[in-house]
Curated annotation (Swiss-Prot):
Gene Ontology CC: nucleoplasm; nucleus
Modification Phosphoserine, positions: S300
Parts forming coiled coils: 299-332
Stretches annotated zinc finger (C2H2-type): 157-179, 185-209
Pfam family, one: zf-C2H2
Record SUPFAM superfamilies: beta-beta-alpha zinc fingers
Keywords: Activator, Coiled coil, DNA-binding, Metal-binding, Nucleus, Phosphoprotein, Repeat, Transcription, Transcription regulation, Zinc, Zinc-finger
GO biological process: regulation of transcription by RNA polymerase II
Keyword tRNA processing: no
Organism: Mus musculus (Mouse)
Name of the protein in question: Zinc finger protein 367
Claim: Transcription regulation is one of the keywords in the record: yes
Length: 340
């Protein structure tokens, strides 16, 4: 090797990996690439021309077209926007650089940030009902908008302190406790004494004393159980949790430390059995049906499978439709500069 100044080596092209696999590369929806300004005779660069959106490329979907349906529900078509922007709600794209070192535009970042809100709003843990009424605690950045909406709303279920409106009277009463600081639901477990604003919070807390874990991972063969519905299985983070009432062997394994705790647990399980007799009746009826007439029981299972299959096919058709609409929008975007 000859000593001297080392020859400059070209840097290898950057490779973007997603989930440790080069096959699933995500790029931003719209990439604005400013043209390199030529240097003037004086030596001062000319002002850069306005940013022109280039070809959207693969947008925020996976590279393979047949996987577009997996994220088609995150597509938002905006024909009224300037230039027509197609946004996709994938927060991963905000963390990844665009290909070929091009900087991300503010439009793509805004699309990603809006997608995060949409994803959180559509998640099962957000508490949306089938009729469109929102439940649960709202996001902190939306409280001001809710207050502004309440000032102009005609609803009578209104908070007299902050003017927020609510779909039901029970929600308003629970909300008012955030102003007064009242916590009427007290845990009566020995030496606990914690108080809560809502009764559901108390029930969730008491599972720590009873050892209940009614939410299980929906992955086949996984035995992970959880106390609350908003947890995620560490082995299967993308699997949903399903509620499964534990058997006596699983639910009553908690060994009390003293006599008072033992009495509290006995009283708790007695009240629990009194509250849920109908659920046990349904489980016993299903077991009896399986033992008495197994053919009829299997037939009912087949009917359930047909219903779930029909729902799955309908969902696939909707995803294909969203994918087709996204393709049409992308074609319009790429063809607009050519027509001009």
């Amino acid at each position: 090797m000859i000593r001297g100044a080392p020859a400059p080596m070209a840097e290898p092209p950057p490779v973007v990996f997603c989930h440790d696999s080069p096959k699933r590369v995500l790029v931003s929806v719209i990439r604005t690439t400013p043209a390199t300004p030529p240097c003037s005779s004086v030596g001062e660069p000319e002002p850069p021309p306005p940013l022109v959106p280039t070809s959207p490329g693969f947008s925020d979907f996976m590279v393979y077209p047949w996987r577009w349906g997996e994220n088609a529900h995150n597509v938002t078509l905006s024909p009224g926007a300037a230039g027509g922007v197609v946004s996709a709600g994938l927060p991963v794209a905000a963390e990844l650089p665009t290909l070929r070192g091009a900087p991300q535009s503010s439009a793509s970042v805004a699309a990603v940030s809006g997608g995060e809100d949409e994803e959180e709003a559509s998640s099962p843990d957000s508490g949306h009902l089938k009729d469109g009424i929102r439940r649960g605690r709202p996001r902190a950045d939306t409280v001001r908008d809710l207050i502004n909406e309440g000032e102009h709303s005609s609803s009578r279920i209104r908070c007299n302190i902050c003017n927020r409106v609510f779909p039901r009277e029970k929600s308003l009463q629970a909300h008012k406790r955030t102003h007064t600081g009242e916590r009427p639901y007290l845990c009566d477990y020995p030496d606990c004494g914690k108080a809560f604003v809502q009764s559901g919070q108390l029930k969730t807390h008491q599972r720590l004393h009873t050892g209940e874990k009614p939410f299980v991972c929906s992955e086949n063969g996984c035995l992970s159980r959880f106390t609350h519905a908003n947890r995620h299985c560490p082995k299967h983070p993308y699997a949903r949790l399903k509620r499964e009432e534990p058997t006596d062997a699983l639910s009553k394994h908690q060994s009390p430390d003293n006599k008072a705790a033992a009495e509290w647990l006995a009283k708790y399980w007695e009240m629990r059995e009194q509250r849920t007799p109908t659920l046990k009746g349904k489980l016993v009826q299903k077991a009896d049906q399986e033992q008495q007439d197994p053919l009829e029981y299997l037939q009912s299972d087949e009917e359930d499978d047909e219903k779930s299959g029909a729902q799955r096919r309908l969902q696939e058709q909707r995803e294909r439709l969203h994918g087709a609409l996204a393709l049409i929008e992308l074609a319009n975007l790429t063809g607009a500069p050519l027509r001009q």
